[in-house]
């Protein structure tokens, strides 16, 4: 098993231990386990201790994966992408809020980032972010791609996105691949072409 996966498991054990332990000395030991694991991850990846602390900030108790939803919208054979602050592009989406469902979160992010009103249609795939996107995340993230029907658009530049445009799948701009990779866009296109024949992909 990959060392980084084992170290992430140690952090999860440490967080659960702090949450459930009733002994102050055991709590200190579990906190120390987290510190050591984060130091080892920082040595073995491109992540700093500060980034690791931020990634796990607010985490406690038994650890479960984070959920990231991505809205997939087609219009005239072109796919909707939003431009991030650094100039790269991605499918509109983000963390799933605890008050949302998969589809409602995808539609919320679609409106907030692209100014698009849509209707959730179907699930295309669920992927483990660390298996399909470059760069290692200290968190386990499940990326859920939801195909949505386009209804209307009223985009305005905001703190998250600079632009929202439709692109031909064979003429894509530079992607923010940690969020949406070229392979993921290609799979979304395959699903679009397959229509009802498409079978949901799940890791």
Question: How should these model regions be labeled?
Answer:
Residues 74-112:
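Conserved Nudix-box catalytic region and its N-terminal flanking loop in Nudix hydrolases
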